[in-house]
C-alpha cells in the first residue's frame, strides 16, 4: 500500500492511504538508519502490514523538496502571513521568511491579514517593495473571510505551509479554511488521539484537494545555517543582473562597477530590499570572522 505521512511522533508514523480515509500507524524499517534517511511529514511512502496488523514503512519515494525548520517533505508553496498592525509589521522578519522560502525553492505568496485595521495607502512603500521583488500579495481579513476564497483556490493541488510571526491570524485562517465539514475528522482524530489541549506536533491536513501543513514551530526563524553564497541566490531581483558585474563572484557590496548597485540606483531594485541584503550579508561575514 502507498500513502502520505501526515504525522510522526515517538518513532511512530501515521500514513493516510491513497484514495481512502484510512490512517495506518507504522514504524520505519531499520534499514533507513543505515541510509541516514529519516521519514518526514509529507513523505510519500510504501508500507506493509504483517500478520499482527503492525505497519512498517518499506520505501520512501524521492522528495521534491525538504524543509528542516519545520521538518516537512514535498511542500510546494508557502503563505507568508503578516499584518501591518496588531502586531506591527517587522520588515526584516518578513524578508527573512522570504529568504527561507527562496532557499527551499518554495513559491512564496505574501498575505497581509487584518486589513480592516489599516489604510492600505499608508503602507504603499512596503507593498511596492514586495511587488517589485516579484511576489504575489493577497490582502485579507480572515475573521470576516475577506478574500479567503482566493486562499482556498491556491491550496488546491498543493502542499501548503503557513508561516509568519505570532499573532497575525494564521490560526484564524486555518480554522476558516479547514472547517468542520472539510476535515477528515473521526478517523484521524481517533488514530492520532489529538485532544483540544494536547501538545501539538506538525501534521498534514487534507482539505479541498490539497494538503495544509499545520505546524506550531514556524512563527520565528533563524537563518544562520545559510552561507553568504546562499544569500546571493535568495534575492530573486538580483537574478536579472547576474553576470553583468565587473568582477566574477561579486557580492554587490563594496565592489566597483556592480550591476546590482546600479540597478538599485536606477530604481529597478527596491532600496529597502537591497539594504536588507547588505545588512544580512554583513551579519554573515561578521559571524564567519568570529568563528576564526
Curated annotation (Swiss-Prot):
Its cofactor is Zn(2+). Its EC number is 3.6.1.-. Binds 1 zinc ion per subunit. GTP binds at residues 113-116, 164-172. GO terms for cellular component: cytoplasm. Its main location: cytoplasm. It is an enzyme of class 3 (hydrolase). One of several proteins that assist in the late maturation steps of the functional core of the 30S ribosomal subunit. Helps release RbfA from mature subunits. May play a role in the assembly of ribosomal proteins into the subunit. Circularly permuted GTPase that catalyzes slow GTP hydrolysis, GTPase activity is stimulated by the 30S ribosomal subunit. This is Small ribosomal subunit biogenesis GTPase RsgA. The lineage of its organism: Bacteria, Bacillati, Bacillota, Clostridia, Eubacteriales.
Amino acid at each position: 500500500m502507498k500513502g502520505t505521512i501526515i504525522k510522526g511522533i515517538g518513532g511512530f508514523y501515521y500514513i493516510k492511504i491513497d484514495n481512502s480515509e484510512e490512517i495506518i500507524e507504522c514504524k520505519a524499517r531499520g534499514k533507513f538508519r543505515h541510509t541516514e534517511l529519516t521519514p518526514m511529514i509529507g513523505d510519500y511512502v510504501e508500507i506493509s502490514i504483517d500478520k499482527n496488523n503492525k505497519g512498517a514503512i518499506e520505501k520512501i519515494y524521492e522528495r521534491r523538496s525538504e524543509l528542516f525548520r519545520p521538518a516537512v517533505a514535498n511542500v510546494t508553496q508557502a503563505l507568508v502571513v503578516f499584518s501591518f498592525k496588531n502586531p506591527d509589521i517587522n520588515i526584516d522578519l518578513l524578508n527573512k521568511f522570504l529568504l527561507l522560502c527562496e532557499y527551499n525553492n518554495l513559491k512564496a505568496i505574501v498575505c497581509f491579514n487584518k486589513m480592516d485595521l489599516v489604510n492600505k495607502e499608508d503602507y504603499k512603500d512596503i507593498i511596492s517593495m514586495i511587488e517589485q521583488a516579484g511576489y504575489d500579495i493577497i490582502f485579507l481579513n480572515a475573521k470576516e473571510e475577506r478574500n479567503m476564497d482566493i486562499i482556498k483556490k491556491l491550496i488546491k493541488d498543493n502542499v501548503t505551509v503557513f508561516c509568519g510571526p505570532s499573532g497575525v491570524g494564521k490560526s484564524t485562517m486555518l480554522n476558516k479554511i479547514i472547517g468542520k465539514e472539510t476535515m477528515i475528522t473521526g478517523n484521524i482524530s481517533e488514530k492520532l488521539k489529538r485532544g483540544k489541549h494536547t501538545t501539538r506536533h506538525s501534521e498534514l491536513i487534507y482539505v479541498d484537494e490539497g494538503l495544509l501543513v499545520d505546524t506550531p514551530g514556524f512563527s520565528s526563524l533563524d537563518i544562520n545555517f545559510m552561507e553568504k553564497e546562499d544569500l546571493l541566490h535568495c534575492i530573486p531581483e538580483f537574478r536579472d543582473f547576474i553576470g553583468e558585474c565587473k568582477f566574477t563572484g561579486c557580492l554587490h557590496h563594496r565592489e566597483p562597477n556592480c550591476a546590482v548597485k546600479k540597478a538599485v540606483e536606477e530604481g529597478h531594485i527596491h532600496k529597502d530590499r537591497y539594504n536588507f541584503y547588505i545588512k544580512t550579508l554583513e551579519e554573515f561575514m561578521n559571524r564567519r570572522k568570529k568563528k576564526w
